[in-house]
Design a protein with these regions (language model features):
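A short beta-strand motif characteristic of beta-propeller blades
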Residues: 1, 31-37, 72-80, 122-128, ...
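Repeated scaffold domains used in trafficking and secretory/extracellular systems
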Residues: 2-8, 40-47, 83-91, 131-139, ...
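Residue-level detector of Asp-centered blade-edge/turn motifs that repeat once per structural unit
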Residues: 10-11, 49-50, 94-95, 140-142
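Structural signature of WD-repeat beta-propellers
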Residues: 18-20, 58, 103, 149-150
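Structural motif
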Residues: 21-24, 62-64, 108-114, 153-164
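Short loop/turn segments that connect beta-strands within beta-propeller blades
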Residues: 27-29, 68-70, 118-120, 167-169
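Blade-level signature of beta-propeller repeat domains, shared across WD40, Kelch, NHL, RCC1
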Residues: 147-195, 206-209
């Protein structure tokens, strides 16, 4: 009997299932290869486009990196002192050279985007959004990165929801979207992290609708 997974993703060669306490790796035929217990509150993972590694993120501010070649832990580290509410999006770059993570930095009301070099998972850049808004998720589509979030006023009250590109260490070309679109696409991205096929619905599609 299979465990009760929160997410279950596949790249056609390996399947990765996360329960929150345990990470399972299966081959494409469903045979269990290994399981890891290096993190708690770890519900979602991402497989590198290169197929050589995968990353698991916990909601308490930690990341674990695993090799799919040796089926072993490569590195585990804390990316933020904020040890709760760390359930925002993450992804690899299209070439697998970088891992991009939305993080709560300072406190749970402030977002950052950190970029890590996958050669050693050292942080190579960080963009802090500050008081003006929050980021919820990030998606790589055809080599470009898109983020979804919301703007805030000086009292930290939400004023508008938006989708934008992320490139060269900054958010660019933001477009405002409706609350319904914001909720719909956040739900789609969550389902994608769970392992569901939502390829026809991307942040790139939403951004393109408003930017043309």
């Amino acid at each position: 009997m299979l465990p009760r997974f929160v997410s279950y993703i596949s790249n056609g060669t390996y399947d990765i299932g996360c329960t929150g306490q345990t990470v399972y790796v299966y081959d494409k035929y469903g045979a269990e290869l290994v399981k890891f217990k290096d993190l708690i509150y770890a519900y979602y993972s991402a497989i590198s486009p290169r197929g050589d590694m995968f990353v698991v993120k916990s909601t308490d501010g930690r990341i674990a990196v695993y090799s799919l070649k040796t089926l072993s832990l490569i590195k585990k580290f804390r990316y933020s002192k904020v040890n709760y509410a760390q359930d925002d999006g993450f992804c690899f770059s299209a070439d697998g050279k970088y891992f991009i993570n939305i993080e709560r930095q300072g406190d749970d009301l402030h977002s950052a985007i950190s970029v890590y070099d996958t050669a050693g998972f050292s942080r190579v850049s960080q963009f802090l959004l500050g008081d003006i808004g929050m980021l919820e998720d990030i998606e790589q589509v055809d080599g470009e990165l898109y983020v979804i979030g919301f703007w805030r006023n000086s009292d930290l009250i939400v004023t508008e929801d938006f989708v934008a590109k992320y490139a060269e260490g900054k958010i660019s070309e933001p477009v405002n979207i409706t609350k319904n679109e914001y909720e719909y696409y956040n739900e789609l991205l969550l389902n994608k992290k769970k392992g569901e096929n939502v390829k026809n619905h991307t942040l790139a599609t939403l951004w393109g609708f408003y930017s043309t």
